[in-house]
């Protein structure tokens, strides 16, 4: 408004003061969506009468076992290759910058029975046979995860994002994994080294060790 009504070049000042000078815009603080180890174990071990709720819990645990893979990438998984799940993180894949982030996750023993259960001839075909697209799948799973949280008394609005945040938090705080390695496992692009990454072979053993360390924490005091 001041730019519209004022013209400092001709000393025309119709609005002398800035009405927003005392307005303080609060800093955006991202809400934490991480669960402690005990809560993850409770989700894993819970029994649900409703098969849809049990399915949502299984999806949550698969996301966690796959180092916090996001739901869009999970729904798009097509196969398993020599005991590994490989994909390119869709969030960082753009036509403009070609920032493809290839990830490879070793199938750990905790994940194996779930993959087998939901693969009927074709890898994870169970979900694609029942849900027409990713958005319907996401909506259905998140709806049931709210019931999981309510039944277990977790006190949070549980959603699929919590699997990713929880894996990262446990890896850093409990498993002692360095932040740089956690970022690598999550598929975060490092713009400072993007060109160097083109020429460097990716060492996924970093991910294997980190994920194994996190999953081993779920086995303690069982």
Segments (PLM) and residue ranges:
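Short, charged phosphate-coordinating catalytic segments
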Residues: 2-11, 63-84, 180
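Short, leucine-enriched amphipathic alpha-helices that occur as contiguous helical runs
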Residues: 55-57, 138, 142, 164-165
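Short, polar N-cap/turn motifs at the start of nucleic acid-interacting alpha helices
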Residues: 80-86, 155-156, 176-198, 219-222
């Amino acid at each position: 408004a001041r730019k519209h009504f004022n013209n400092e070049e001709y000393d025309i000042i119709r609005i002398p003061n800035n009405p927003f000078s005392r307005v303080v815009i609060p800093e955006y603080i991202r809400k934490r969506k991480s669960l402690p180890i005990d809560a993850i174990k409770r989700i894993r071990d819970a029994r649900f009468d409703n098969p849809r709720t049990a399915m949502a819990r299984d999806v949550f645990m698969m996301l966690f076992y796959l180092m916090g893979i996001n739901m869009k990438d999970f729904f798009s998984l097509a196969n398993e290759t020599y005991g590994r799940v490989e994909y390119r993180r869709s969030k960082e894949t753009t036509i403009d910058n070609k920032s493809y982030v290839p990830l490879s996750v070793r199938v750990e023993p905790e994940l194996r029975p779930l993959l087998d259960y939901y693969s009927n001839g074709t890898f994870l075909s169970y979900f694609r046979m029942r849900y027409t697209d990713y958005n319907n799948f996401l909506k259905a799973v998140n709806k049931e995860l709210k019931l999981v949280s309510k039944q277990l008394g977790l006190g949070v609005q549980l959603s699929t994002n919590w699997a990713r945040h929880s894996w990262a938090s446990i890896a850093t705080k409990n498993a002692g994994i360095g932040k740089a390695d956690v970022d690598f496992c999550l598929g975060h692009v490092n713009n400072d080294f993007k060109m160097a990454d083109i020429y460097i072979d990716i060492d996924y053993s970093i991910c294997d060790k980190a994920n194994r360390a996190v999953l081993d924490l779920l086995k303690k005091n069982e």
